[in-house]
């Protein structure tokens, strides 16, 4: 996938009072290109999580169209979506979608067993780099939110993709951990030629973005 296009897209809930200055909603043809780094800056309630859910096909309560390389995503089959989510879009939701009863490592390996993208040694190095070496066997329910966020970042990096889509990926991280995460994601994105689309309401992932879009 090379391009995600939003055409006059708007959450249905905003239909009565559409935003006047959004650089995303109601744009006649907003192209998000592979290999480009985008920050989607938003206020709370502006629809950033909705945007991510729309792009990933988890919600359809919007007007307008979303296209993948010119194809309307509403025409995609379940099989298409399984392939896209496994090979083309790596998604980190704001709620992290971790399994609290499983260990940090098991949460990561659930993904990696589907993608076979990283070795156990590579995953162990990511745990070490992100200060989670001693949390390998810890149930996610026993971790702080910031630690859970780092586990979810490691899981995100366990697949090939053309687009990294991240909803407030560092909202509970300090600046040092933010920079470490940014370096890891940027390195992986450049290796794959992937785009980064990251949302924020005030604590953005510390990247050198190509474009900042106000939601």
How should these model regions be labeled?
Residues 139-147:
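Conserved ABC ATPase signature
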Residues 120-135:
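Conserved ABC ATPase "signature" region
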Residues 64-73:
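Conserved ABC transporter NBD signature motif
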Residues 73-90:
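ABC ATPase NBD coupling module
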Residues 164-168:
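Catalytic Walker B motif of ABC-type/P-loop ATPase nucleotide-binding domains
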Residues 95, 101-114:
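Q-loop/switch helix immediately C-terminal to the Walker
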Residues 56:
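Helix-to-loop junction immediately C-terminal to a conserved catalytic motif
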């Amino acid at each position: 996938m090379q391009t995600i296009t939003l055409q006059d897209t708007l959450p249905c809930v905003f239909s009565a009072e559409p935003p006047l200055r959004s650089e995303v909603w109601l744009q006649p043809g907003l192209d998000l290109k592979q290999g480009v780094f985008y920050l989607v800056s938003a206020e709370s309630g502006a629809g950033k999580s909705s945007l991510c859910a729309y792009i990933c096909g988890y919600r359809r309560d919007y007007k307008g169209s979303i296209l993948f390389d010119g194809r309307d995503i509403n025409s995609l089959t379940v099989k298409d979506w399984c392939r896209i989510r496994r090979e083309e879009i790596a998604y980190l939701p704001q709620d992290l979608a971790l399994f609290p009863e499983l260990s940090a490592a098991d949460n990561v390996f659930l993904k990696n067993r589907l993608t076979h993208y990283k070795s156990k040694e590579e995953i162990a190095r990511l745990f070490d780099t992100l200060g989670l070496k001693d949390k390998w066997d810890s149930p996610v329910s026993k971790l702080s939110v910031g630690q859970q966020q780092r586990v979810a970042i490691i899981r995100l990096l366990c697949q090939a993709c053309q687009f990294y889509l991240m909803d407030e990926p560092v909202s509970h991280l300090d600046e040092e951990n933010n920079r470490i995460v940014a370096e890891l994601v940027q390195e992986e994105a450049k290796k794959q030629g992937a785009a980064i689309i990251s949302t924020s309401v005030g604590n953005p992932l510390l990247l050198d973005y190509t474009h900042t879009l106000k939601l």
